[in-house]
């Protein structure tokens, strides 16, 4: 701390002379690199004579370069000086930029790879000799330092030494780091360091390591006592230590949250308030509004029966109205459209079905029906069942979307314009009359995409369908005319996932271009672009209150975004592979994520902590879903297995152990929460869906 | 800085770096596109650059594979990975087996090339039988019903074949499985669930075998349909036996039903029921989810009895019991193929039983036919070792019957069938054993009476093209002859419906027979009583044959108590051998004491 204070004071005191001295050193550096035209232009701009230039010695250049690499404020001043030069000569500026970029990795001309290797070896010895309670946390430091030393050796052109260095010390790392290391080892030339996204990310954003205060003080003492200038330099530039009070973590707790490309999540990343409660006021408005209207309009003999039916419904709902959830966002936090009368009737129908729901528990397991898609020549890439469980939409590798009716009701088309004009628009059954009964079919095909369809999503109103594809477009299909009504073009790369908001009107998509986008159905432009992931955003999911969006990425992180502000409000690390599926719990507080590493992790969105890890699957977990009452978590994957987990027990154990936040579960006993495992014969699972009465529907592809 | 030449690097063989294209490969590729000579340094630079680009393309292709819910990387994934990089994808590399290349080595180099077959346009235009690919179909079935997986064909069997094998080898594992959650989701008996609450688990309790009410009803329906008179219903029952999962708990009772049925009906000379029971055995063999190794000690004696028994039907000269022997021989061959191991030596023991009957000069002609049929189904080597050396002796046995010197018409028919069987199975083997000039004199000297006919058959086989050689071991068991034989036997045989009523018998000698039958199998469901003919001659036949029936019953009781399949088979065979001597008592000094008991009883009866 005292060193930092002295540096700041020294910098402020010599601001003017320091600035000019830096300029002279820059000119000296340009002259050294034989960039004569740039040198002459810069001399004219700055009114610097050759006499002043000769006063600067070689050692002064080295000192200024060291100061530039160390201090961040000097970068802005240097860029300001560069801007006149950029306008004059492009190629010279490009070479100058390349030279300066590479200079970041080179401290001096006499680069010594052996010196770095010796420093790393001493650090490794220190970690191995430390006490057992601190060893696992200190070992988290090895990977980022190893990678940065590799970058430095590679930037100086010593590629063979860099490879030997990695070969010698890679056995220290855990298995999930080897895969990330493999990507970095694709680099073989110094110029490629400037283009690789991971290298740029590790340079801009520091690698985050959570460490207890005692471990951190041990580490600092090691760096200072043994005069490890090399390691101290790397630590100050590229590492960020998020210290916490309490005991150090053991091996399991360290591994639980490690594995991401940018280390672990900072405490600051999960500080913001998240309103994870549900929007309950919307339902009451829908119920109170239609209550007086039918009574006034009805003059039939059935009028006395209707008030009797309405009264028992009002009482339990009115009692709920008095309760206010402190964790729920306000109803106008994001603008939601007004519900139409037909949508209100649909919601009433859904509420009535929910009252007949089967209560699932360990003693009452759900029943499941399996839909198998046969004769699919290029494979089923996605499957989706509508919320009312009447339709099944499948996307295929041959760019087509097919919809099946799962009930005896057929899929009917809207009547033509002349017939529609003759209809009575004020009649009660207008929604039934406008459909053509003669056009009923069991299945319909939707053609339009030019690449595999990776996701279909039904609108909550059951009249629209979204699909996204490898051809970088998102299409909105009408389920009344069975045609494509809108094509959204915003992503330039394949779109991996698309989801409708639970309240309709909004949908979100994620893509190969590392972004997720929030759209509205009546606009061609994206309303929000969620930027922050370092790799593909593989899956996306709306929160039940439509205010937040969760994304899973190939950089092995799960993020929660606020739709109102577009910011990342939660960052959760712990997966060892790409995140392949996401699901919110019924209460909105917990998030389950499945991954290519065969694991399922439960997160608490109130503080972003890891609740538990479920280990049972032996292949990619392709689909996760919660039961409607939130007591059972169903997961399935490409290993032809359906697993049912006791989520009620998970939350009970988590809340009772909620005292110590920084420590996670000590033991990952596999069978504590597992209720049942059901294998299918020859069908990997594509989708799972709980109906409103808690019947589980599975969709699989028969693998011949 | 950018113009600085990089140092030459040696090819890396590290696992972490993965494979990389060698400079030699780059030179070969350069030659293929017309570049005459490529220097070593340029080849190395190109190899490294191409290797890095290929690895990036493959990594992106893995992303497309994951999002398509697949675990195999296909050519289409590579195409989409190239498309993302704004590179034109390769065309013409669509392959179903994921490997579009063929491997060839010549001139000291290893090459992979794209197979490009030449297609005859005439064939394409002439044949219009191109099939339209099947349309998409959506099938639904119950996967789980309240936490239990129903045993429908779309669901996996509750206990796989490997689990059944593990149960038979190590029964102690069952105690652990009772407490395992994985087995709890499958339909099992209630005993395992009850064991969870009992602190002290006794091994003896696990030996109990409970069937649910549905399973008992299923067992009753299946067994009645398989041996009933309704042929379409029998077909459905056999189809269900051959394909349904979840039958492993009823398997012990099924095998016992077949074994007891064969014992009773072979005494009653009921050919139709024997045929039905053999078809049940075949259905159980065809079921892929059943593990039959634990029940071979009941199935193999039953099948062996149907092959080598002396008399299988009431009227040997009219009924086609030869078809049953052929069918059972094919069943035995399939059993040996499926279950023969180095520890049980199943095929060796079966072959020994057949060859022992062949070595005996006093074997009945029907049993001789069965032995030859059984050996011929076991393969060419068995025919070469066991049948060919005995051809001369078989000729001496059947020559008197075929030349008309025998009075019995049954023996004449049997001799004809034996000759037909030998002419069918021996010529392909003889063609390989003997040299080209086939003369009738040589064959007559070597094989006796059958020599000239065998010579003609061998000559015919030599002149036929190689593609038309009959395959001896056919995997498919033909059921058409056996079905027609069953219908014939049912029509001709005067068999009453299954009933437990005992009808009056005119002869005094029949009463001990009926009493003996009921005493030995009191709980048997099917007891068939033959009506006696009013003719005096027929009564004499019945009276004279009562002694062999008693002997057979004793042998059957003895065989039932034996747990070793070899001993059981020997018992059945010895019982058949004893019946070959009508009223003559033969005492073999070196036989087992049990066989001595049979001989003593036979001596006393006569």
Curated annotation (Swiss-Prot), chain A:
**Subcellular location, in the record's words?**
Nucleus
The UniProt entry annotates WD repeats at: 376-405, 448-478, 490-520, 532-562, 574-604, 616-646
The residues the entry assigns to the signal sequence are none
What PROSITE patterns does the database record attribute to this sequence?
Answer: WD_REPEATS_1 (PS00678), WD_REPEATS_2 (PS50082), WD_REPEATS_REGION (PS50294)
The source's superkingdom equals Eukaryota
List, in alphabetical order, the GO biological process terms annotated in this UniProt record.
transcription initiation at RNA polymerase II promoter
**GO CC annotation, single:** nucleus
Biased composition range(s): Basic and acidic residues: 314-324
- TM annotation in the entry: none
> A Pfam family matched by this chain, by name?
WD40
UniProt keyword list: Nucleus, Repeat, Transcription, Transcription regulation, WD repeat
Q: What is its main location?
A: nucleus
Return the annotated region ranges for Disordered.
Answer: 287-336
Assembly, in brief, is: Belongs to the TFIID complex which is composed of TATA binding protein (Tbp) and a number of TBP-associated factors (Tafs). Interacts with Tbp and Taf4.
Biological role:
TFIID is a multimeric protein complex that plays a central role in mediating promoter responses to various activators and repressors. May play a role in helping to anchor Taf4 within the TFIID complex. May be involved in transducing signals from various transcriptional regulators to the RNA polymerase II transcription machinery.
Q: What family, per the record?
A: Belongs to the WD repeat TAF5 family.
Q: What is this protein called?
A: Transcription initiation factor TFIID subunit 5
Source organism per UniProt: Drosophila melanogaster (Fruit fly)
Q: Which gene encodes it?
A: Taf5
From Swiss-Prot, chain B:
Q: Keyword annotations for this protein?
A: Nucleus, Phosphoprotein, Transcription, Transcription regulation
Q: Does the keyword Oxidoreductase apply?
A: no
Q: Is the keyword Cytoplasm in the record?
A: no
Compartments where located: Nucleus
CDD domains assigned: HFD_TAF6 (cd22931), TAF6C (cd08050)
Per the record, the GO terms for biological process are: RNA polymerase II preinitiation complex assembly; transcription by RNA polymerase II; transcription initiation at RNA polymerase II promoter
Role description: TFIID is a multimeric protein complex that plays a central role in mediating promoter responses to various activators and repressors.
Protein name, UniProt field: Transcription initiation factor TFIID subunit 6
Naturally occurring in which organism (per UniProt):
Drosophila melanogaster
């Amino acid at each position: 701390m005292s060193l930092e204070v002295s540096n700041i004071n020294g910098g402020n005191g010599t601001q003017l002379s320091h600035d000019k001295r830096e300029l002279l050193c820059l000119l000296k550096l340009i002259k050294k690199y034989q960039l004569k035209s740039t040198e002459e232009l810069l001399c004219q701009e700055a009114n610097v004579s050759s006499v002043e230039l000769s006063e600067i010695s070689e050692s002064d250049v080295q000192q200024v370069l060291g100061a530039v690499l160390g201090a961040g404020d000097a970068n802005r001043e240097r860029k300001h000086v560069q801007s006149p030069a950029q306008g004059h000569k492009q190629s010279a500026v490009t070479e100058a930029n390349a030279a300066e970029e590479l200079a970041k990795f080179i401290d001096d001309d006499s680069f010594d790879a052996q010196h770095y290797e010796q420093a790393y070896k001493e650090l490794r010895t220190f970690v191995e000799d430390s006490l057992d309670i601190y060893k696992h946390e200190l070992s988290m430091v090895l990977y980022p330092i190893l990678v940065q030393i590799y970058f430095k050796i590679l930037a100086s052109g010593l590629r063979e030494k860099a490879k030997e260095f990695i070969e010698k010390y890679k056995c220290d790392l855990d298995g999930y780091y080897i895969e990330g290391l493999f990507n970095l080892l694709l680099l073989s030339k110094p110029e490629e360091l400037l283009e690789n996204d991971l290298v740029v990310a590790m340079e801009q954003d520091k690698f985050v390591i959570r460490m207890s205060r005692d471990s951190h003080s041990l580490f600092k003492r090691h760096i200072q006592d043994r005069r490890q200038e090399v390691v101290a330099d790397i630590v100050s530039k590229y590492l960020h230590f998020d210290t916490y009070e309490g005991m150090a973590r053991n091996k399991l707790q360290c591994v639980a949250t490690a594995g991401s490309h940018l280390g672990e999540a900072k405490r600051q990343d999960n500080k913001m308030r998240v309103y994870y409660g549900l929007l309950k006021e919307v339902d009451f408005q829908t119920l109170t509004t239609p209550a007086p209207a039918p009574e006034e309009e009805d003059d039939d003999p059935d009028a006395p029966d209707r008030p009797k039916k309405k009264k028992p419904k009002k009482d339990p709902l009115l009692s709920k109205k008095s309760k206010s959830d402190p964790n729920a966002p306000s109803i106008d936090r994001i603008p939601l459209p007004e519900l139409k009368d037909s949508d209100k009737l649909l919601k009433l129908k859904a509420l009535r079905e929910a009252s007949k729901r089967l209560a699932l528990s360990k003693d009452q397991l759900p029943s499941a029906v399996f839909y198998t898609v046969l004769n699919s020549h290029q494979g089923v890439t996605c499957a989706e069942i509508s919320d009312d469980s009447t339709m099944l939409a499948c996307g295929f590798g041959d760019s087509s979307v097919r919809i099946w009716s799962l009930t005896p009701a057929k899929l009917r088309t809207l009547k033509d314009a002349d017939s529609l004009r003759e209809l009575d628009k004020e009649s009660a059954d207008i929604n039934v009359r406008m459909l053509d009964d003669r056009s009923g079919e069991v299945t319909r095909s939707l053609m339009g995409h030019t690449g595999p369809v990776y996701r279909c999503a039904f609108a909550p109103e059951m009249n629209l369908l979204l699909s996204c594809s490898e051809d970088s477009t998102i299409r909105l299909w009408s389920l009344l005319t069975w045609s494509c009504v809108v094509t959204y073009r915003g992503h330039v790369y394949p779109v991996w996932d698309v989801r409708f908001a639970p309240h309709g009107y909004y949908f979100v998509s994620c893509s190969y271009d590392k972004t997720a986008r929030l759209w509205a159905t009546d606009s061609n432009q994206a309303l929000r672009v969620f930027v922050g992931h370092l790799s593909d955003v593989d899956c996306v999911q709306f929160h039940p209150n439509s205010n937040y969006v969760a994304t899973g990425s190939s950089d092995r992180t799960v993020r929660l975004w606020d739709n109102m502000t577009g910011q990342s409000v939660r960052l959760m690390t712990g997966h060892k592979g790409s995140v392949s599926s996401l699901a919110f719990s019924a209460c909105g507080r917990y998030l389950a994520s499945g991954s290519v590493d065969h694991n399922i992790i439960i997160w608490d969105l109130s503080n972003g902590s890891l609740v538990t890890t479920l280990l049972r699957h032996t292949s990619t977990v392709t689909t996760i879903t919660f039961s409607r009452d939130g007591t059972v978590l169903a997961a399935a994957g490409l290993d032809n297995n359906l697993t049912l987990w006791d989520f009620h027990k998970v939350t009970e154990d988590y809340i009772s152990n909620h005292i110590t936040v920084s420590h996670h579960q000590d033991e990952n006993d596999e069978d504590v929460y597992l209720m049942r495992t059901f294998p299918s014969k020859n069908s990997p699972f594509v989708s799972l869906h709980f109906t409103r009465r808690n019947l589980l529907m599975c969709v699989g592809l028969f693998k011949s | 800085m950018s113009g600085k030449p990089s140092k030459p690097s040696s090819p890396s063989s590290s696992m972490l770096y993965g494979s990389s294209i060698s400079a030699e490969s780059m030179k070969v590729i350069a030659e293929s596109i017309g570049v005459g000579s490529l220097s070593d340094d340029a080849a190395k630079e190109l190899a490294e650059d191409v290797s890095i680009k290929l690895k990036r393309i493959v990594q992106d292709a893995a992303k497309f594979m994951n999002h398509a819910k697949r675990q195999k990387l296909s050519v289409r994934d590579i195409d989409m990975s190239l498309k993302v990089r704004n590179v034109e994808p390769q065309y013409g590399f669509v392959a179903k087996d994921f490997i579009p290349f063929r491997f060839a080595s010549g001139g000291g180099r290893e090459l992979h090339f794209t197979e490009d077959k030449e297609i005859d346009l005439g064939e394409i235009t002439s044949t219009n039988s191109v099939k339209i690919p099947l349309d998409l179909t959506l099938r639904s079935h119950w996967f789980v019903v309240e936490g239990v997986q129903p045993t429908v064909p779309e669901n996996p069997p509750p206990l796989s074949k490997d689990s059944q094998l593990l149960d038979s080898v190590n029964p102690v594992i069952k105690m652990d499985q009772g407490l395992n959650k994985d087995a709890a989701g499958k339909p099992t008996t209630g005993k395992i669930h009850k064991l969870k609450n009992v602190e002290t688990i006794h091994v003896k309790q696990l030996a109990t075998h409970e069937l649910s009410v549905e399973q008992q009803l299923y067992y009753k329906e299946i067994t009645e349909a398989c041996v009933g008179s309704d042929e379409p219903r029998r077909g459905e029952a056999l189809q269900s036996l051959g394909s349904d999962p979840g039958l492993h708990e009823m398997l012990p009772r099924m095998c016992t039903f077949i074994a007891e049925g064969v014992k009773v009906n072979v005494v009653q000379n009921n050919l139709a029921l024997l045929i039905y029971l053999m078809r049940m055995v075949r259905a159980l063999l065809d079921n892929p989810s059943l593990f039959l190794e634990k029940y071979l000690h009941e199935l193999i004696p039953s099948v062996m009895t149907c092959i080598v028994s002396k008399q299988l039907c009431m009227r040997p000269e009219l009924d086609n019991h030869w078809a049953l022997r052929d069918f059972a021989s094919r069943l035995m061959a399939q059993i040996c193929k499926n279950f023969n191991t180095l520890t049980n030596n199943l095929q060796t023991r079966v072959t020994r039983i057949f060859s022992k009957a062949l070595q005996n000069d006093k074997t009945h002609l029907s049993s001789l036919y069965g032995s030859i049929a059984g050996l011929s189904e076991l393969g060419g080597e068995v025919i070469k070792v066991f049948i060919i050396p005995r051809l001369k002796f078989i000729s001496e046995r059947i020559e008197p019957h075929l030349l008309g010197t025998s009075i019995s018409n049954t023996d004449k028919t049997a001799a004809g069938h034996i000759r037909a069987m030998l002419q069918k199975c021996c010529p392909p083997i003889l063609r390989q054993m003997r040299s080209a000039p086939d003369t009738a004199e040589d064959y007559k000297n070597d094989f006796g009476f059958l020599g000239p006919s065998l010579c003609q058959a061998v000559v015919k086989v030599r002149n036929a093209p190689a593609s038309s050689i009959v395959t001896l071991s056919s995997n498919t068991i033909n059921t058409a002859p056996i079905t027609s034989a069953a219908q014939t036997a049912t029509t001709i045989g005067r068999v009453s419906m299954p009933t437990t009523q005992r009808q009056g018998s005119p002869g005094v000698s029949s009463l001990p027979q009926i009493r003996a039958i009921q005493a030995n199998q009191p709980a048997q469901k099917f007891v068939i009583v033959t009506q006696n003919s009013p003719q005096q001659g027929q009564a004499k036949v019945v009276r004279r044959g009562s002694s062999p029936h008693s002997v057979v019953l004793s042998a059957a009781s003895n065989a039932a108590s034996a747990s070793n399949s070899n001993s059981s088979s020997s018992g059945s065979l010895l019982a058949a051998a004893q019946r070959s001597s009508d009223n003559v008592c033969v005492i073999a000094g070196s036989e087992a004491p049990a066989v001595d008991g049979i001989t003593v009883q036979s001596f006393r009866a006569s």
